[in-house]
């Protein structure tokens, strides 16, 4: 059913070494959380800008895939303007409606005058082969699509997979948080900080045009 598909690598570096396949991956949520929120001088609503800026300074023009949903994709797109949209080869979906997200990113590239076919949309949220194929059929003629499928492939037993997510909750003695595109997936030990971060994002979305 998937004859035109191929495995290009794994994010598990041990398996990549063992089976001599390419290690692949993207930046982590923790990178954006700590770079943007682990400094008291930074407005946390600009976390993506600080993280993207530091990433580009380190890697130049070989920047790979950017992660969009650390403090919501809408806030990410405020910072993912022409320079970063050009320098990064694509973006990764990890929460929220993947079909709505894909349409939003294609529209974003087009608004910047960038041909979406030159960019990659990497989907990685709770995928199986059938869902990945539906996404592929939806977007394949407009953009390059790729998929990160973990639990469905790795949990090949009859047992229900455990839902284990590990995220940073503090950096440099400061609270940090992830506010994704899926309501209720916030991750932080300090509810007051989550409220503060949410208000910062809301203010920016309303005032930063």
Q: Residue locations for each model-derived region?
A:
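Gly/Ser/Thr/Ala-enriched C-terminal appendages of enzymes
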Residues: 73, 96-119, 124-209
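Buried, small/hydrophobic-residue-enriched core segments of structured protein domains
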Residues: 1-104, 108-109, 139, 170-174
């Amino acid at each position: 059913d998937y004859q035109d598909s191929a495995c290009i690598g794994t994010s598990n570096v041990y398996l990549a070494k063992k089976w001599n396949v390419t290690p692949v991956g993207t930046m982590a949520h923790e990178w954006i959380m700590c770079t943007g929120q682990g400094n008291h001088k930074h407005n946390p609503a600009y976390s993506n800008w600080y993280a993207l800026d530091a990433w580009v300074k380190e890697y130049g023009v070989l920047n790979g895939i950017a992660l969009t949903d650390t403090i919501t994709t809408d806030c990410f797109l405020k910072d993912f303007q022409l320079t970063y949209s050009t320098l990064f080869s694509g973006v990764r979906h990890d929460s929220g409606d993947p079909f709505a997200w894909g349409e939003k990113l294609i529209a974003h590239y087009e608004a910047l005058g960038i041909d979406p076919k030159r960019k990659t949309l990497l989907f990685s949220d709770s995928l199986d082969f059938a869902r990945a194929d539906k996404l592929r059929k939806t977007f394949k003629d407009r953009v390059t699509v790729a998929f990160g499928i973990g639990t469905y492939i790795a949990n090949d037993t009859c047992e229900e997979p455990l839902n284990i997510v590990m995220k940073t909750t503090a950096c440099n003695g400061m609270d940090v948080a992830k506010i994704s595109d899926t309501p209720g997936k916030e991750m932080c030990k300090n509810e007051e900080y989550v409220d503060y971060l949410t208000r910062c994002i809301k203010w920016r979305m309303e005032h930063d045009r």
